[in-house]
Amino acid sequence: MNQRLFIQKKSEFDVISQKTTIELQNLVPHAVCKVFVIYDLFGIDENQLAKVQNTIFVDPVTDILYTHYEDAIVENFPYSKNFFATEFLPGQYNQRDDSAEQCLLLMNVEGVTVKSGMLYVFNGELTNEELLKLKEYLINPIESREKDLSIMEIPSYPTATEVPVIEGFVEADESKLKKIYADFGLSLEMDDLKFIQEYFQSIKRNPTETELKVLDTYWSDHCRHTTFETEITDVDFQSKFNTTLQKTFEYYQKIRQELGTTKPIRLMDLATVMGKYLSRTGVVKNIDVSEEINACSIVVPIDIDGEEEEWLLQFKNETHNHPTEVEPYGGASTCVGGAIRDPLSGRSYVFQAMRISGAANPLEKIDNTLPGKLPQRKISKEAANGYSSYGNQIGLATTFVKEIYDEGYKAKRMEVGFVAGAVKKEYVRREEPVAGDKIILLGGATGRDGVGGASGSSKTHDGLDLDDLSAEVQKGNAIVERKIQRLFRNPEVLKLIKKCNDFGAGGVSVAIGEIARGIYIDLDKVPLKYAGLNGTELAISESQERMAVAVEAKDVDTFIALAKEENLDATCVADVTDDETMTLVWRGKKIVEIDRKFLDTNGVRKQAKVIVTDEEYPNPFEQKEFNKEQFIQMMQELNHASQKGMVEMFDNNV
């Protein structure tokens, strides 16, 4: 049978209703709200329900159980018709569902599916317009939707269709290419699409949909830093500091000459040239250099019980501005989760984090929210909840938390996570995979949530509805990443790994595609969260908490067995080949076959001219007169307000 439960906290314990009411009264001052958790249990019999009802779902001391929402409404607001229910969109990870199903298995109740939601019941003095306001505030269409309480069914997923070939692509004129560009919603530029057309003309075939999407992802700004790799053809200084700037630029060019650098001037070169110079000249001797694309790494001496050992200290920062802007909780949680993945893929144990964020005024009236955006208050509060929840669950000491307030962040929020990790150097084996080696996918399963995350964060967003971005942000699963952290504490495991890459932006096509020059990936072996994903979605979904691990063929079974000891799924999904081609196979057909040399071009290099001018910013060194009025004005600024409440959400002493 199927059963629906409505769980409400007793008034003495109903903190969630109190908090929700206070929050919503910023929008509708006379609103009063009661919150219920909904559990839909599919395939459970009466005996099983009796066994688990008061163990997993209801605490008789603190909770009240209803089986019909009408009863819940009558008990709280008799005659009120102001209520609605919400649920996550199909395909979004729901930790409450996952935890409930695991608890059922622990009690030997198998075959039961759990789908949860929330019921919000309001006092009867609300107008339809006010109820609609509350509904729009509580439901973010990128992650959730209104739940129909008259229906109780498991969401169905469409059957995966074959990957189509883009007919007529190689013959397309510019107008046809522009239509293809618009139809596929590409983040690439038109000159990149023409470059792709030239490649497929040279091999005399049309690309598949997957090949075009993979290139759009692989060459995205998020994955390949195309903005920082843009060639700077001319620099013009128009500043009051011209002399100083010109001397600095000439010094930079001199350093390039000493290093023998012939590549074009780029922002990436400006950022890295001094590190290369100091390393080359022997000033800096502890930089750990490798072919892996993971975190920054330095070699440090560590005193272990009086013995000095060489360890790798690794650190990484990650921005999740776009994801947090559109889905604050998931965007901020996967900010720290994504930052952790980089040093973790470098085999480090991540032990420390910092968070710096930027927002406009969170006290702004919700009615003043810009069209197509979430209220600043909602973004700030839910982002703090998301980041702290993920870090606290994984067991990470977040030792610095700061939010900066400026109206400029209304255009785009800033969400920055920083982490540090360490590993004993002798445990890290770094070798280039060779033909015959195997690639193991370690960790979470793949879902539709995360398709387009890399290309989405690389686009210019003009007038998009939040609904259009629903697949680009995921909910993280900190518990799975914590298991990977534990697994990688085992020296036996680390010594099996020749090379490792985390599943960040781009999913399988990037994480496994980068690990060796020749790779053959069987997408049918990729574990799924649910049925219905097609080959394109399998190739580019960046579902969280996964690693691509290269091992020798003889070590596959050993690695998988060690992963199972940590309750981690590990599946061999790819082979390293010697043909310098990235090949992806789905349902026995090649849906991607791209030459490595073409893939490595990263598209058409962009060019730009730079004009350096002065901006009208307040002079930070200006000495203002100290008086009562200026002191009061300064203390009234948001950036001088106490952030203690936010800081205390983060565990800083794990």
Name every feature range the model reports, one short phrase each.
Residues 1-11, 35-40, 78-90, 119-120, ...:
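Short glycine-/aliphatic-rich beta-strand segments at the starts of folded cytosolic domains
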Residues 11-28, 53, 92-108, 513-526:
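Short amphipathic alpha-helix segments
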Residues 19-74:
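Acidic (E/D-rich), amphipathic helical modules within compact regulatory domains
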Residues 59-111, 256:
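Short, solvent-exposed interaction modules
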Residues 91-93, 111, 117-130, 135-654:
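Glycine/proline-enriched, intrinsically flexible loops and inter-domain linkers
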